[in-house]
């Protein structure tokens, strides 16, 4: 039973190493073919890292996420073209690039220097002008940008593939439990928080410990889900 599983069993420990930019990778597994062709036309190269191989939202997953968010907003009579969205864990740009095609503006935040440079490169390679990027921990700058958007998306690290070894999985950002991070966003008056998580996220623990009243769960066939959490 879940009550007999300790936090240590639920949350893997992984030693962090900096990402490495890779060459000679088949980018069609990760980016939309049209985006790859556009980067070639622009005489620039999309880039990916070793961590990006498993952490990026591949273009079809990114599209699925965007579609779910747009459906949610339209049900609330909100036009996504009038909306700015924050991507708090932008990585190398999988979700941010897709969001830029449907939202007015994307505020993309990345904490890692190498991924920030790859993110900047990929945005430039596609000649995207409605993404504003920040090199920062989103918790440190949310106060300065929250007036630009009350929709916050994030995809915290899953610890590589080791999440698959757990029946129930607890996400963390640094030392903070994911419910604590979500409650910080609530306290910052973020109206809509969207979380990408592995399929085995410990939902009961999460829901019982967040301040938001509502949560919609969407599952896809790629071992992941998104949670739309709101007032």
What label would you give each PLM region?
Residues 13, 81-83, 104, 147-150, ...:
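Short coil/turn segments at beta-strand junctions that form active-site/ligand-binding loops
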Residues 145-214, 218:
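S-adenosylmethionine
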Residues 56-140:
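SAM cofactor-binding core of SAM-dependent methyltransferases
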């Amino acid at each position: 039973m879940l009550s007999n599983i300790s936090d240590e069993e639920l949350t893997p420990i992984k030693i962090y190493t900096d990402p490495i930019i890779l060459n000679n990778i088949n980018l069609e597994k990760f980016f939309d073919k049209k985006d790859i062709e556009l980067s070639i036309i622009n005489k620039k190269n999309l880039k990916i890292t070793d961590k990006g191989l498993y952490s990026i939202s591949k273009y079809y997953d990114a599209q699925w996420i965007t579609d779910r968010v747009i459906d949610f907003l339209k049900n609330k009579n909100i036009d996504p073209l009038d909306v700015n969205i924050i991507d708090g864990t932008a990585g190398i740009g999988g979700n941010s690039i897709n969001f830029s095609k449907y939202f007015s503006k994307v505020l993309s935040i990345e904490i890692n220097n190498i991924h920030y440079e790859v993110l900047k490169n990929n945005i430039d390679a596609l000649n995207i002008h409605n993404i504003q990027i920040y090199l920062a921990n989103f918790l440190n700058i949310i106060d300065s940008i929250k007036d630009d958007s009350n929709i916050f998306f994030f995809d915290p690290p899953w610890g590589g593939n080791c999440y698959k070894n757990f029946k129930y999985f607890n996400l963390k950002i640094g030392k903070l439990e994911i419910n604590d991070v979500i409650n910080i966003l609530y306290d910052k008056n973020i109206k809509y928080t969207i979380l990408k998580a592995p399929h085995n996220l410990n939902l009961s623990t999460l829901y019982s410990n967040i301040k938001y009243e509502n949560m919609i769960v969407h599952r896809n066939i790629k071992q992941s889900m998104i949670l739309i959490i709101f007032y």
